Amino acid sequence: LAAQTRLLLRKAIAAYAGRDAADRLREAEARLDDPLRVAIAGKVKAGKSTLLNALIGDELAPTDAGDCTKIVAWYTNGNTYRATLYPSGAEPRQTPFSRDQGAIEVDLQGLDPGDIDRIVIEWPSASLAEMTLIDTPGLASVNEEISKRTEDFLAFEHDRDTPADAVLYLMRHFHRSDARFLEAFHAEELAHPSPVNAIAILSRADELGSGRPDALESAQRVANRYRGDARVRRLCQTVLPVAGLLAQSGATLREVEYQALAALAAL
């Protein structure tokens, strides 16, 4: 299928030679060789960064309310450890970063988060070799400018392709505002994420019902109900319950922590 797609794109590039469309087609061909780009979106405190850390298998993305969570952040596989700032209307620049037994702290070099288009974190990782993960600022933020950065990144109501190949949309419950957001992916143009590559995540599933022992089972039933709802089905491929913090803890479990759990289980 990839070979057929490449051949079709090359024919289209030749047919549209000299037009603006040819550049977009060349970009599409180049992306065939890149890892899948998956954007993670959702409201503030939905658990986006926690899920991203679980998918990477390492605690890289900050989960607090610091400046870095107000900027679109790309996490991509690299041969070395590097952070690059992409200021709006200026040349990209490498920047120092620190990591003290936790998330990466990037030096913004005195720039306001609103003046930075994106941060790219290169990190040697088998998980990131398969897909580039994109953490986006929270929607429905008190600061509308922060939410707008995510909307602009995903190319809502703009005549350009979104940089994301697929979108994971995190929600606690399916509200009208969630439907409006997912409808933005239901574009007629194939270049935009559609229900085929938009997945709804019922996040923080272990907290359902005030964290009852059967919370995960309850979350699965809720997800099943949403999957059977025609209004939801037309907006996303499926709905999956996820306990992001549990997944992150499992993916980043250290040997000493495993031994402690094994000792407790033996009591």
Regions flagged by a language model, labelled:
Residues 15-35:
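Long amphipathic alpha-helical scaffold segments
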